[in-house]
Amino acid sequence: MIGNLSGIVDEVRSDHIILNVNDVGYMVYLSAKTLSACAIGSRIKLLIETYANNRENTTQLYGFISEEEQQCLRLLVKVSGVSYKTAMSILSKLTPEQLFLAIMNEDKVTLKMSGLGLKLINRIITELSGKVSKLEINNNNFHPINEDALSALINLGYEKMKAYDTIKKYRPNLDTKDIIRMALKELSTL
């Protein structure tokens, strides 16, 4: 079993890289977000998840920059009907924080994407809602927020994740009116 790989990026493709580790090139599949951080010639260290694809008689490597993203993949593939490829496409669209919030809030709109039907989205929410709340999450990645400010922005028509990403920058103990005012100002410039 491979825990991590550290090497130089030789090639960047649409869904994977070739990582040169001591003159051996490993094909490592990445989420779109991780892939966008890779440049040919750059040195990178990835956490690795190994998948033995028995149907195609191959072993595939999936790479992650953060433990949270790796945890998400491990949780997602335990859900019946979620393949590694599907899990990676989810992680390409959502950060671990956004995924956890969508599951905890049963936010089907955020989870809706190509390749995920309503039944599978419901199964993901049902099977993972209890597990997500018990996860050990790096406190640097999850921020307490002013729920009233979030609710106000959503009621004004802003997308839930965009509103959350905006107001998490402000201290939750600020006055709700001030948070809403600052968030509206920021959202109007986007």
Swiss-Prot record:
| Signal peptide segment | none
- Major location category of this protein: cytoplasm
What's a GO biological-process term for it? Answer: DNA recombination
State the superkingdom. Answer: Bacteria
Asked if Secreted is a keyword of the record, the answer is no
Task: Give the span(s) annotated as Domain II.
Answer: 66-143
Would the keyword Signal be found if you checked this record's keyword annotation? no
Region Domain I: list its residue ranges: 1-65
Q: Where is this region: Domain III?
A: 147-190
Instruction: Report the family membership.
Output: Belongs to the RuvA family.
Please provide the record's free-text comment about the domains of this protein: Has three domains with a flexible linker between the domains II and III and assumes an 'L' shape. Domain III is highly mobile and contacts RuvB.
> What does the record give as the function of this protein?
The RuvA-RuvB-RuvC complex processes Holliday junction (HJ) DNA during genetic recombination and DNA repair, while the RuvA-RuvB complex plays an important role in the rescue of blocked DNA replication forks via replication fork reversal (RFR). RuvA specifically binds to HJ cruciform DNA, conferring on it an open structure. The RuvB hexamer acts as an ATP-dependent pump, pulling dsDNA into and through the RuvAB complex. HJ branch migration allows RuvC to scan DNA until it finds its consensus sequence, where it cleaves and resolves the cruciform DNA.
Question: Which protein, by its recorded name, is this?
Answer: Holliday junction branch migration complex subunit RuvA
- The source organism is Wolbachia sp. subsp. Drosophila simulans (strain wRi)
